[in-house]
Amino acid sequence: MARNVTAVKTRTNDSAKVDMYTVPAKNTAEIHMIYILASAGNEDADLYWYDSATTTEYPLAHAKALQSTNGEYLLLNELQIDLKENDILRVKNSGTSSSITYMVSMNLKPALATQFHS
């Protein structure tokens, strides 16, 4: 049975790339919405997907020079990005003088399992 999950992470005055959400073991996640909002400053914001099966990181979203004074944001709706167990969403601000909130909405459901009987 699937359930809706929203992961939220706010990064303030820090440009280090950090983990935002890890798909739990024996689950899959289907991303439907990505929302990135600047509440202070004027910097780039990046969202990444780390594929644990191939140990490869992919860029998912990039918001260039979001200005909090103008209420700028990036909204990607009606997506279908499938993640597998232990995949990781990561976020990174481009500088150290901003506050950016990242929100990702997804459906989380148990992974299909195959059993073999002798």
Name each model-derived stretch.
Residues 64-73:
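Short proline/glycine- and polar residue-rich coil/turn motifs
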Residues 80-97:
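Noncatalytic modules at the cell exterior or secretory-pathway interfaces
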Residues 41-61:
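Short, surface-exposed beta-strand/strand-loop-strand elements in extracellular ectodomains
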